[in-house]
Amino acid sequence: MKLYSPAGRALWLTTFALAGLGACKSVKGTFSATPTATISKRLPPLEITADPGPLAMNDGALPEDPLRLFKAELQRNVLEPTDTATFGYARLVVTKVKTVRTGRSLQAAQVITFLIPSIFGAPLEWYKTDLQAEVQMMNANGELLGTYTGKGTSSVKVAMYSGYSQTEAPRLADVIALREALAQIRPQLDTASTRLRPLMMTGGQVNNPTLPGSSKQ
C-alpha cells in the first residue's frame, strides 16, 4: 500500500491520531492540590474519618480519595495542628453521587473522519459528576454537635491537548465535585466554629480514635 494512496493516507492519519491521544493535559498535582482558605477560628484537633457511600461504587474516585481530600481540607483550613490529643471527630459522608458521560456521539463522528478533529483538540466526550456530601462534627463521646451539607459539580473534557485522558477524566470529575462540596461546607464550619470549639474542648479527649462504621487513615 502506497503512503500517498487514499487508503494509505487514511491509515497514516488514523495511526497518528491514535498515537496522539496520549498528549493530554497533565493531572500532576491536581489530585493533591488543596486551596488555602482558613476559617477565622480553628477547631481543636479531631479524629478524621470518611464514609464514601455511593462514591465507592463509582468508576472514578479511588477508595482512598474521599478521606485523603477531607483530611487535607481540614488540616489546611479548619483544624489546629495535631500533636497527640484529639477532642472529637470530623466525619465526611458522601450521600449522593451521579456521573454521566456526554458527547459520546462525537466519537463516532471522529472515527468517520479518521480522528482528524482530535489532532486539533476536538473533545471526545465529557465526564460530569454531581455530588452531595455532609460533614458531621462530634465530641469525644461521639455525640453529634452539627451536620453541614455541600454540593459539588464537575465537567471534565476528554481531549488531546485541551482536555484529559480517558483514564484520568472519571477520577478527576469525582475529585473536583467532592472538593467543591467541601468548599461549600467550609464557610458553614467557619460560622459554627465559635459554638463547636468550646463544646469539643469541654467534652474531653478522645479515647477511641475510630468511630464504628467509619474509615480512618
List each language-model region with its residue ranges:
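Sec-dependent bacterial lipoprotein signal peptides
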Residues: 1-24
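A short, hydrophobic secondary-structure junction motif
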Residues: 3, 79-80, 130-138, 180
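C-terminal/domain-edge helix-coil "capping" segments
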Residues: 29, 124-132, 144-217
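Conserved aromatic-histidine-acidic binding/catalytic patches
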Residues: 58, 62, 119, 123, ...
